[in-house]
Amino acid sequence: MSQNTQTLLITGSAGFIGSNLVLRLLDSQEPLSIVGLDNLNDYYDPSLKEYRLSVIQKKVDTAQRHTYHFIKGDLADKALIDRLFAENRFDIVVNLAAQAGVRYSIENPDAYIQSNMIGFYNILEACRHSYDGIPGSTETGNPGYQGVQHLVYASSSSVYGGNKKVPFSTDDRVDNPVSLYAATKKSNELFAHCYSKLYNIPTTGLRFFTVYGPAGRPDMAYFGFTNKLLKGQTIQIYNYGNCRRDFTYVDDIVEGIVRVMRKAPEKKTGEDGLPIPPYAVYNIGGGQPENLLDFVNILQEELVRAGVLPKDYDFEAHKQLVPMQPGDVPTTYADASALERDFGFTPKITLREGLRKFAEWYKEYYQ
């Protein structure tokens, strides 16, 4: 590997977004040394995670300028995290590992505290200590190493809670979470700001809005609905279909991550002589919220088109309109103007395009 090779840590690399990010990075022109970390837990079918890893491995086998090394491990294992940082000297860290799911956080709160809070703290501490021995850097074992140059981490649109004002802006207050999952994600932003202020670590949080696409998470509506319809089961549509979601295709999410990670917040000194926190938060969302019933209709059409379901499938007999669930919100709607301003990027994939790609993948993978 060249001396100019950047070393990256991608946590949650067998997850939906993480695996797609690794695949995207393996197409990069500049040489990269990528370490992927994932605990491969059974929150959903681990075989889907193994499938994603196999797709990555096929690409790694033909990669000319990159290396990729996967490690099975947990963010909450501080000794493991510290060892990884000591051995690899990461330039960029993208933390996508987390216990996901709003409703699941009501049933299993411990998993969220361990992964989303303690795990994120371990990452922050490791980033902090990556600066040990700098300047001088004789203690680092790599005279040119300058510590972690950028920590990018997954936040969530759920931090907006029950906010009534739409679209959701990063300037809005986000101190009224309606689920433990949302509270842990907001805590990540607070932790990151603290470490940016105290230790001058450049951090950027990304609030993702309803990510979907091929090989996604089976607990997400589009995937779960497909599984149930195929089995002849009834799908439940919350808030009697009056929810709106800002669906964002996974490739758009990944493109946003790649652009952001390459441009860290600038380190500056304030008038008091102390560092101005090199800290930022952005929304990544399509900015076009879809009514849940319209979303279901498009999904149905694309499942029929792909041959997942027959043309004469009785969809009306398999729908049930039900009340809002605890922890849910009626609307998510991203104001992503800051992302466009600073990085020249706006999500582009339409809901129909994205669901078509999902339906075609589903047909190939399961049938």
Predicted regions and their residues:
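Conserved alpha-helical elements of sugar-nucleotide-dependent glycosyltransferases
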Residues: 17, 221, 291
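Residue-level recognition of oxygen-bearing side chains
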Residues: 80, 111, 118, 173, ...
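C-terminal substrate-binding subdomain of Rossmann-fold SDR/epimerase-dehydratase oxidoreductases
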Residues: 7, 24, 64-65, 122, ...
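N-terminal Rossmann-like NAD(P)+-binding domain of SDR-like oxidoreductases, especially those catalyzing
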Residues: 1-211, 298
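Heptad-repeat alpha-helical coiled-coil signaling segments
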Residues: 210, 216, 243-245
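Non-catalytic, surface-exposed connector residues within folded enzymatic/regulatory domains
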Residues: 34, 47, 106, 202-205, ...
